[in-house]
C-alpha cells in the first residue's frame, strides 16, 4: 500500500488501524475481532497472547514494525493510529498509552464520544492525549450528548486540539432536512452546527 501511495498528493497520512487494542490476557485462536457494532465487525486485536509482556510495549513494537515498513516506501506521509478513548490506569487506552505513542507517531489521533452525564471522562481523555505531538480528534459525533452541548465542548477545547473530524454517515444536511425521524433531525442539527465551527476553531 505504501509503495502504491508514496507519490500521491492525495495521501495525507497512514492510519495503522482503527481502534486497535492489546488484550489483557490470551484470546482463543483466531479471535481477532472485538465484537459486532452496527452490523460490522473488524480486526482490532494486535496480538492474541500478550504472554506477560507490558501492553504498552506490545503496542510500541507493533507500531514500530509497521512504521518501518511504511517508511521504507514512503518518507513523506504522516503516520498515526486511531485510539480508543480509555483512561482507566489498568488499561491506559487498551495498551496504546498516548505518552508512549507520542514517541512513535507523527501525531496522536483519538476517537471521542462525550457523554452528557459524564463530560469529565472526555476531558480526561483529551488531557491524557496532550503531549508534545499534535492531537487530532479523528471521530466525534453526538451519540451520547446533544448537538448543542457537544458543540460547546468542542469550542471549549479547540486550543488543545489541532483538528476535529466528525463521524459522517454519508447524508448531507440538505437530504437530512427532508427526513422524518428524530435521528435524522439530530444529525441534521449537528452537521449544520459543524459547518459553522470553522469560524470558532479554524486555524
What are these regions (language model features)?
Residues 1-5:
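Short amphipathic alpha-helices and their capping/turn segments at secondary-structure boundaries
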Residues 6, 10, 19-170, 176, ...:
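Extracellular glycoside hydrolase catalytic/binding regions
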Residues 168-203:
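Aromatic- and carboxylate-lined catalytic core of secreted/periplasmic carbohydrate-active enzymes
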Amino acid at each position: 500500500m505504501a509503495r502504491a501511495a508514496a507519490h500521491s498528493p492525495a495521501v495525507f497520512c497512514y492510519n495503522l488501524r482503527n481502534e486497535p487494542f492489546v488484550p489483557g490476557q490470551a484470546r482463543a485462536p483466531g479471535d481477532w475481532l472485538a465484537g459486532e457494532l452496527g452490523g460490522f465487525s473488524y480486526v482490532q486485536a494486535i496480538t492474541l497472547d500478550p504472554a506477560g509482556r507490558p501492553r504498552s510495549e506490545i503496542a510500541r513494537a507493533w507500531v514500530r514494525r509497521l512504521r518501518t515498513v511504511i517508511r521504507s516506501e514512503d518518507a513523506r506521509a504522516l503516520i498515526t493510529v486511531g485510539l480508543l478513548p480509555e483512561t482507566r490506569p489498568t488499561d491506559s487506552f487498551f495498551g496504546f498509552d498516548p505518552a508512549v505513542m507520542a514517541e512513535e507517531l507523527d501525531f496522536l489521533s483519538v476517537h471521542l464520544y462525550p457523554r452528557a452525564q459524564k463530560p469529565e471522562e472526555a476531558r480526561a481523555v483529551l488531557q491524557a492525549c496532550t503531549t508534545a505531538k499534535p492531537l487530532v480528534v479523528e471521530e466525534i459525533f453526538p451519540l451520547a450528548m446533544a448537538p448543542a452541548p457537544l458543540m460547546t465542548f468542542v469550542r471549549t477545547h479547540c486550543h488543545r486540539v489541532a483538528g476535529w473530524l466528525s463521524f459522517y454517515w454519508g447524508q448531507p444536511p440538505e437530504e437530512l432536512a427532508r427526513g422524518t425521524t428524530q435521528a435524522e433531525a439530530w444529525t441534521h442539527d449537528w452537521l449544520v452546527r459543524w459547518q459553522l465551527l470553522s469560524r470558532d476553531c479554524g486555524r
